[in-house]
Every structure is written in structure tokens, then in C-alpha cells.
């Protein structure tokens, strides 16, 4: 049995399995969570967490109300990259369109709706103030007013400030301010609280990302799913921690954090609340029958009579672009989920991006990166192919040993090892070079799967989206053909059954890659093609050298 080929194809299978199995692995250790308790659902639909006030030794027991409502009084804010709707009832952002990212290749004029407040799908960014009425959290509901119903960032403006005005019954004058910046998906959200009353005001600032249960994108051997769910960062303890919707349903997260961030993730896109780096907050999750929430509630805020105070946070609504996320908050770029080999994937993406700036096409960038990787591993691959060539030359002698010893496996094994020693051939010589390359292959896979830059990126001819499957499945068929050619270059197994199994593998991998993103299949085709050329060259060169040496030896 050809052990080298078995190990090789097992390694290839592991690559495929890693793509759909390791995707769901939460590689950091999980934070302890508290048992589920009741939560407070306010009249506007906000969920308030269980909190422990400074003057209480026990957590507050919360009660849930049954109804939630929202107003239809919306204002629209449009920048060069965002189109958002703000509900004047409490000033929640209930719609967020990403203007530079079309919904689909077929509908380029319709922007991708990251946030939306539809009956079928609810995904909104809430922020509010609340107080404690005894031991019960009481949300401060504001019917804000706005000077205009439509705001637009002009081409000659770098910043747009939208101010909502509101008053509370207990003497608070509140201005809720949204600061939009040209070319940015980051929104500053600030509450300017003025205490016009005669008594000390004490309350809390609460931010949330709330979404209804999305359609699950499960992984299988023929499809690679993407992570959709919540996550957070607690500096010094958890750089990046996922919290799946199933985890939320089982128990509530309860984490004290300084700085950090909370987020809702999906393939390519992200929403995140980023508190000030020096602010202390409690991160929490809550789940109802329909909605899942991750939130951050501040430490108590006090405002003396006739004084004012500003509290706020930053909200990101946009694509998962590593360079952008790095500049917003530490570890936020880890939401570009490159898996356990993220450090290697980051290097490969930087190389791809550098090539893209020159060639201007992500497809050709994939091709050139594959060529560079192949060049980097040229010597290792050459060692592997030389081993294959040696094994091919030994096939007649190995077959003669099998015919000579028949069913005596012990003698066949002993004679085979003596033959390897005599001919100075290592049967496993081709395995190690291939195994060393596997982490690089897997890391590049993650880059091609996770990078939003490849979403709807065209290549050539009919390939107009490298992140989607080839609509005509031509690339998977070409990939299968390259695998078949590679097999023809390898030494043929002496066992007929093993030969049939090996012939079936190209069909298996063609099916495996049938619905894979075109960028992944393109990478594999280029890699296989380069491997075929290198193997053919080395095998031919090796075969030409050996007979010459044999003639010289005979002449002597």
C-alpha cells in the first residue's frame, strides 16, 4: 500500500473538514455565565439587565412586561456610506443601509440592509437612560423632536451632527446627539443631560444590539457556514469571545468590563457598541422567544441640580474590514474570523491586498498569491515529487516481490524495507513537505472565505462574484480534472481496490467544492496546475538522469 498517498489525501480531507467544522469553534475559553433570570421589557421594547445597585447586597428581581411598541416618527440621515433611520421615540437607530455594498450582484442599485425593523426581521441599535424605581429599572422614555426630517452630509462637509431634543418628567433636559463623519461607518452617540430640577439625579446609560432569530447558516461537507451571533471583548481577560444565540437561550452573560466592546456578527458585516476605553460597564445578554440582545450598562451616573453631564458611546455599522476595525478598538478586528490560524491568515491577506493595489483585480491577486506560495515551498515540493519519482521507478520491483512471496505479508514487508534501503528511497519522504504546507493552505482558505473585499468581486468571463459559487460549476469541474491529472502522475497502486478508491477521490472533491466560493476553487485550480507542472518537470528530469548513471556504472 502506498502510505504516502494515503497520508496526502487524508491531509486534503482534513483541510475540507476544517473549513466547516473548525468554523464553529470558539477558540478562546468561555466566560462563566449566570443562570437565566427575569428581565425588564420596557414600553419601547428595550430589555434591561439585572443589576446590583451600590446600596443593595442582592440583585434586583426584575419583571417582564408583555408588550413592546415603537413609533413611526422617523428621521432619515444620509452620508456618503450610510443611510440610517432614527426613531424619535427614544432615538434608536432602526435602519442602516450600507451604500457601498449592494444587496446582490443582480441588484446593484439596492444597498445592503444591515439594520432593519421589519416584521420578518428585526435588527436595531438601541441606546437609552434608565433609573431605579425602588428595585425596578424604569426606562426614561423620550419623545424627541428634531429640526428636520431629512439630514444629508454634503460633499463639501466632513462631519454631520444630528441633535434630538427631549425632556423628562423629573426635570431633565436631554439632547441626544449623533455625529456622522464622511467616509466612516462609526457614529458617535452622546447624551447631554442637564438637570434643571432641585434634586440629585441618578441613573444608568444602556446600549444594546437587538435582533430577531436569523435563519441559521449551518455548515456541512458541501457548504461552509458563517458565524452569526454576538461577541464581546473584555480587555485583559477575553480579547474576543463569541456568544451564540443558543448560548443566550440557555443562560445570561454577566461580565464586568472596562472599555472593550459588544457586537453582533454575520458574514462580512458587523454592528458594535464601543464604550470609552476608561468607562466601566456590565456586559450582558438576554433572550426572549423572538429576540436576542447583547448590551452594555454603565456604572451609576449622577447629575447635581443645575449641572450637566455628557455620557455616550460609539456605534459601528458596517463591513468587517480589518484595517478599519483595528483603528476603532483593540481586538475588534478579530471579528474578521480567520479561525485558529488568524495570525498567518492576516499576513496572507496583507500580501493579497498589496498585490490587489497593483493589479486591481482580486481574482488575479489570488492567482499571484498562489504562485508566490508555490515558489516559497518549491524546494519542499520538489523533495516530495522526487520521492514520488523514486517510488514510481520501484513499482516493477515491488510488484515482483508481491508475486514472489504471495500472501506472506511479513516477508513482503521485510523485503520491501530492504529494497527501500538498498535503493536509498524513503517511502515517507513525500509526506512531510506536504504536511508542512497544510497550515498555509488552511490560512489562505480562511482569508478567501472571510474577507469582505472578495464579496461581489469579479474575476473574468462569467465569474462576477468570487465569494459565491460558480453559477455554471465550470471551476469545480476544472478542479476535478486537475486532481485526476495529478493522480496520473503519481505511482499507480499495486492493489486494484486501492486504485479504484484513488480514482474516486477527484469525483469526491469535485462534489465537495461544487458550491464553494469561486475564489476558493480558483486558488485550488491554480495550486493544482502549478503542482502538475512542477511534478512533471521533476519526474521527467529525474527519469532522464537515472538511466545515464546506470550506463556509466555498467561501462565500468
UniProtKB/Swiss-Prot annotation:
Entry's transmembrane regions: 6-26, 332-352, 358-378, 428-448, 501-521
One of the record's GO molecular function terms: membrane insertase activity
Which cystines does this chain contain? Answer: none
What InterPro entries does the entry give?
A: Membr_insert_YidC, Membr_insert_YidC_N, YidC/ALB3/OXA1/COX18, YidC/Oxa/ALB_C, YidC_ALB_C, YidC_periplasmic_sf
**Gene Ontology terms describing biological process:** protein insertion into membrane; protein transport
Cellular compartment(s)? Cell inner membrane
Cellular component terms, GO, for this chain's entry? plasma membrane
Q: How does it sit in the membrane?
A: Multi-pass membrane protein
Which keywords does this chain's UniProt record carry?
Answer: Cell inner membrane, Cell membrane, Chaperone, Membrane, Protein transport, Transmembrane, Transmembrane helix, Transport
Q: Give the UniProt family note.
A: Belongs to the OXA1/ALB3/YidC family. Type 1 subfamily.
| Subunit record text | Interacts with the Sec translocase complex via SecD. Specifically interacts with transmembrane segments of nascent integral membrane proteins during membrane integration.
What NCBIfam families does the record point to?
PRK01318.1-3, yidC_nterm, yidC_oxa1_cterm
| Described purpose of this protein according to its UniProt entry | Required for the insertion and/or proper folding and/or complex formation of integral membrane proteins into the membrane. Involved in integration of membrane proteins that insert both dependently and independently of the Sec translocase complex, as well as at least some lipoproteins. Aids folding of multispanning membrane proteins.
Protein name, please?
Membrane protein insertase YidC
- Supply the source organism for this entry: Legionella pneumophila (strain Paris)
Amino acid at each position: 500500500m502506498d502510505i504516502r498517498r494515503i497520508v496526502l489525501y487524508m491531509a486534503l480531507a482534513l483541510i475540507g473538514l476544517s473549513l466547516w467544522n473548525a468554523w464553529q469553534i470558539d477558540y478562546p475559553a468561555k466566560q462563566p455565565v449566570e443562570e437565566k433570570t427575569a428581565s425588564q421589557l420596557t414600553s419601547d421594547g428595550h430589555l434591561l439587565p439585572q443589576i446590583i445597585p451600590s446600596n443593595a447586597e442582592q440583585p434586583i428581581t426584575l419583571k417582564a412586561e408583555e408588550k413592546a411598541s415603537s413609533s413611526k416618527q422617523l428621521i432619515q440621515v444620509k452620508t456618503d456610506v450610510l443611510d440610517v433611520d432614527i426613531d424619535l421615540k427614544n432615538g434608536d437607530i432602526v435602519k442602516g443601509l450600507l451604500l457601498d455594498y449592494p444587496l446582490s450582484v443582480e441588484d446593484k442599485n439596492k444597498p445592503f440592509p444591515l439594520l432593519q425593523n421589519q416584521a420578518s426581521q428585526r435588527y436595531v441599535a438601541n441606546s437609552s437612560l434608565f433609573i431605579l424605581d425602588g428595585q425596578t429599572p424604569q426606562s426614561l422614555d423620550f419623545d424627541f423632536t428634531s429640526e428636520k426630517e431629512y439630514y444629508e452630509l454634503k460633499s463639501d462637509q466632513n462631519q454631520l451632527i444630528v441633535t434630538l431634543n427631549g425632556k423628562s418628567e423629573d426635570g431633565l433636559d436631554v439632547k441626544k446627539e449623533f455625529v456622522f463623519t464622511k467616509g466612516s461607518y462609526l457614529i458617535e452617540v452622546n447624551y447631554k443631560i442637564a438637570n434643571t430640577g432641585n434634586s440629585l439625579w441618578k441613573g444608568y446609560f444602556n446600549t444594546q444590539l437587538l435582533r430577531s432569530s436569523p435563519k441559521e447558516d449551518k455548515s456541512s461537507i458541501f457548504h461552509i457556514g458563517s458565524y452569526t451571533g454576538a461577541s464581546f471583548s473584555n480587555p485583559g481577560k477575553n480579547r474576543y469571545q463569541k456568544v451564540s444565540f443558543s448560548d443566550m437561550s440557555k443562560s445570561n452573560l454577566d461580565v464586568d468590563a472596562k472599555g472593550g466592546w459588544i457586537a453582533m456578527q454575520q458574514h462580512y458585516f458587523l454592528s458594535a457598541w464601543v464604550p470609552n476605553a476608561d468607562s466601566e460597564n456590565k456586559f450582558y445578554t438576554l433572550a426572549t422567544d423572538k429576540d436576542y440582545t447583547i448590551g452594555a450598562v454603565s456604572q451609576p451616573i449622577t447629575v447635581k441640580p443645575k449641572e450637566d453631564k455628557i455620557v455616550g458611546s460609539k456605534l459601528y455599522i458596517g463591513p468587517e474590514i480589518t484595517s478599519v476595525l483595528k483603528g476603532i478598538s483593540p481586538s475588534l478586528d478579530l471579528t474578521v474570523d480567520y479561525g485558529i490560524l488568524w495570525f498567518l491568515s492576516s499576513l496572507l491577506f496583507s500580501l493579497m491586498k498589496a498585490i490587489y493595489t497593483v493589479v486591481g483585480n482580486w481574482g488575479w491577486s489570488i492567482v499571484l498569491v498562489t504562485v508566490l506560495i508555490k515558489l516559497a515551498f518549491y524546494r519542499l515540493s520538489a523533495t516530495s515529487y522526487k520521492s514520488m519519482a523514486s517510488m514510481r521507478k520501484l513499482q516493477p520491483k515491488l510488484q515482483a516481490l508481491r508475486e514472489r512471496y504471495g500472501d506472506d505479508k511479513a516477508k513482503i514487508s521485510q523485503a520491501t524495507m530492504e529494497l527501500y534501503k538498498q535503493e536509498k528511497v524513503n517511502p515517507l519522504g513525500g509526506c512531510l513537505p506536504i504536511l508542512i504546507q497544510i497550515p498555509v493552505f488552511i490560512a489562505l482558505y480562511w482569508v478567501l472565505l472571510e474577507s469582505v473585499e472578495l464579496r461581489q468581486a469579479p474575476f473574468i468571463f462569467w465569474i462576477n462574484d468570487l465569494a459565491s459559487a460558480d453559477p455554471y460549476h465550470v471551476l469545480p469541474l476544472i478542479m476535478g480534472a486537475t486532481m485526476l491529472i495529478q493522480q496520473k502522475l503519481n505511482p499507480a497502486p499495486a492493489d486494484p481496490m486501492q486504485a479504484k478508491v484513488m480514482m474516486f477521490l477527484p469525483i469526491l472533491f469535485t462534489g465537495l467544492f461544487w458550491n464553494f466560493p469561486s475564489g476558493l476553487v480558483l486558488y485550488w485550480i491554480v495550486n493544482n496546475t502549478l503542482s502538475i507542472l512542477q511534478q512533471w518537470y521533476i519526474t521527467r528530469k529525474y527519469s532522464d538522469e537515472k538511466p545515464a548513471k546506470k550506463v556509466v556504472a555498467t561501462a565500468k
